[in-house]
Design a protein with these regions (language model features):
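Long, hydrophobic alpha/beta structural blocks
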Residues: 60-65, 70-244
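Structural detector for short beta-strands of small beta-barrel domains
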Residues: 249-269, 339-344
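Short, charged beta-turn/beta-strand-edge "cap" motif at the junction between a beta-strand
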Residues: 261-263, 308-317
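OB-fold (S1/OB) nucleic-acid-binding surfaces
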Residues: 264-289
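Short nucleic-acid-contacting surface segments enriched for D/E, G, S/T with interspersed K/R
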Residues: 290-307
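Long, charge-rich boundary regions
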Residues: 300, 372-421
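OB-fold/S1-family single-stranded nucleic acid-binding modules
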Residues: 312-340
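Short cysteine-rich clusters marking metal-coordination/redox-active sites
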Residues: 343-346, 361-364
Length: 421
């Protein structure tokens, strides 16, 4: 069972208890470049006031025990923290979890050293996300409305009116984003797996995603929805500058360097090249599904670029590579083509007389000792290039959010952030 649906069930339970919600449920995405399936890269934080914390803890632990799909590899983690403020150590842990690999041992040691009340099943990998979620500080945020199916519909094909989603996006954009792929005429709000989510709408406010949900047309009877405050769409994982002398596998971040090898298109349509950062050369890969391979192909030696992505571990057949998630061109070199000179009398290209012997016009005999230079116009520009929206990750900051920052959001209890149908 997915983390957000389990949170939805817990919130429905808490609504019936004598508790007070003091913030929206928070959905925090951590480092997406960690390879294992249950990797703690999505975690939910619930902040409440209660007079009976021990009872609430027992009930939530029971929810985790009853509904977690441990047989299929789930490793849920649960952390409880009671105080008026969050210690700096939690914030530091959370920042690291955004971009690096944090081991289960590190998480368990953190819990032990700080005497934290916790619970986990499986190998405890979920504790990484649980600690990180408590310590996470929003510097920007979006919202996602997740609408859930009834249990009888789990695993069945989702049937949604495509035109209603397309129209919804045209009306609500840019207050909502990445709902419909116009280029491929494809709905983006519905997942493809058997999970309980029917659709998810992302946007800038609770009002915008709730309004958008009223425009989505489907005949399926749904269970309800919950709105999460999230770091999705903020590129949180790419704010860390990678250290070229210590590029650890699965870390995320950015590098600034100069292209030092000609881009090569390999099998599958993926493009690889290297950049020079200080005295180190870093191999970079731009993949076909991002649809920015043509941009990568047009890079030349000396171009200064800013890249964000994750470090793929070296293997027997492949070397270590930075998997590119964005490509920002800072400076373009002039593309100079050296050619045989043109005879000023005959207006024809001269021919080479041999190595270091200059050039001669085969018609009139005029001579020249140097080649002519011709500047070829560049096909790419100094700008940021992002993948096609079909290849966006949860954390990808789309074009329309580049200058957008939602720093403050008062918890408005009058808004319908939870709705049980």
């Amino acid at each position: 069972m997915c983390t957000t649906f389990l949170s939805y069930k817990i919130v429905k339970f808490l609504e019936k208890q004598k508790i007070e919600f003091v913030d929206y449920p928070s959905l925090i995405r951590f480092n997406p470049n960690i390879p294992w399936k249950t990797r703690g890269n999505g975690a939910v934080r619930l902040t409440i006031k209660t007079r009976n914390p021990n009872k609430i803890k027992k009930e939530i632990i029971q929810f985790i025990t009853n509904y977690s799909d441990t047989k299929n590899g789930a490793n849920p983690g649960l952390v409880f923290f009671q105080d008026q403020s969050i210690p700096q150590s939690f914030h530091k842990f959370s920042k690291l979890a955004l971009w690096k690999l944090i081991s289960r041992k590190t998480a368990k040691d953190f819990i032990s050293n700080n005497k934290i009340d916790s619970f986990y099943l499986g190998n405890g990998q979920g504790l990484v996300g649980a600690i990180g979620a408590i310590g996470y500080k929003f510097s920007d945020h979006t919202f996602e409305l997740l609408c859930y199916r009834k249990k009888s519909q789990f695993g069945k094909k989702r049937i949604i009116n495509k035109h209603s989603v397309k129209k919804m996006q045209s009306i609500t954009f840019p207050e909502t984003y990445n709902s419909f792929d116009n280029e491929n005429d494809r709905v983006l709000i519905t997942p493809h797996g058997p999970d309980p989510v029917f659709y998810g709408i992302r946007g800038e406010s609770v009002k915008s995603v709730v309004l958008a949900s009223t425009m989505v047309d489907t005949d399926e009877k749904l269970d309800g929805y919950m709105v999460f405050k999230s770091n999705q769409g903020t590129a949180d994982h790419l704010k860390n500058e990678l250290q070229v002398n210590d590029l650890k596998p699965y870390t995320s971040g950015f590098l600034v360097g100069k292209v030092c090898s000609k881009p090569v298109t390999e099998q599958g349509g993926h493009v690889f090249f290297s950049i020079q950062v200080g005295d180190r050369k870093i191999r970079c890969g731009v993949y076909k599904q991002t649809k920015i391979t043509k941009i990568a192909q047009d890079l030349i030696l000396g171009d200064k670029i800013h890249l964000g992505g994750g470090i793929r571990k070296a293997s027997k057949n492949y070397e270590r590579v930075l998997n590119v998630e964005f490509l920002d061109i800072i400076k373009l070199e002039k593309n100079i083509l050296l050619t045989n000179p043109t005879c000023k009398t005959c207006n024809k290209k001269m021919k080479s007389k041999g190595n270091r012997q200059g050039f001669e016009c085969f018609r009139c005999g005029n001579k020249s000792f140097s080649k002519s230079s011709l500047e070829i116009p560049r096909k790419i520009q100094r700008k940021l290039y992002l993948p096609a929206i079909s290849a966006h990750r949860h954390l990808t900051r789309p074009y329309q959010r580049l200058k957008k920052r939602n720093k403050f959001e008062i918890f408005d209890t009058s808004l319908e952030w939870l709705n049980i149908f």
